[in-house]
Amino acid sequence: MQIRFDKIPSFLGLPISDLEDLAPNQVAIAGYFCDNLDKTFAGQRYLARQLRYVSRSKAVPLNATDLGDLNVFPLETEKHFSSVISQCEAVLELGAYLVLVGGDSSGLKALGAAVQNVINPDVPIVSLSNNNKLNLSKTQKIILSVDLKELAGKWLSKPRRLNGLSPSQIISQINNIPNKIIAVAIFGLAPELDSRGSTETQVALNILEAVVKRLDKGAH
């Protein structure tokens, strides 16, 4: 009897790579499985897994890859941040763009520290809500924060508020940011793990795809 092996789920159906496979200007997407260190609420750590499960091969840049999940130590704060920062630095040192997916905003903090250490201490973190207020030059390198808590309640299975942004508004803002994005954190969503979470998971997947396309566009 022939045994059939299904393809391992990956972000956007992209190839799965190791660190040593990365090349300059490649977009590396990594899962961040930690949601108990900053602005915590349970379930955010499952976002990366859910996005992989619902992903299909899309017309996304071939210059992108799924790097797997970062090693995390959520019960040992100092060890955790040291490890995550080091792993982010290793990607950035290769000249690749890094996208962290899932978890709480502690991933963004670690990513910011890594960028400061590798690229420049003055690289700012820019959010969707403040990108038009900073008056940065178009050549300014930035870290983009995509906090999915900014989604309007109608797109979420467990809304915390009614007002907010639609998926198309978030994607439009991502596409129109004029600066050079070198790293991105997508976080803040605890998707339901059954059919109730299908809408919010698909919305997050579309936003991830927009981020990857925007990074690839900026590399050329």
Where are these regions (language model features)?
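Catalytic cores of soluble, metal-dependent hydrolases
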Residues: 2-34, 40-99, 106-111, 131-220
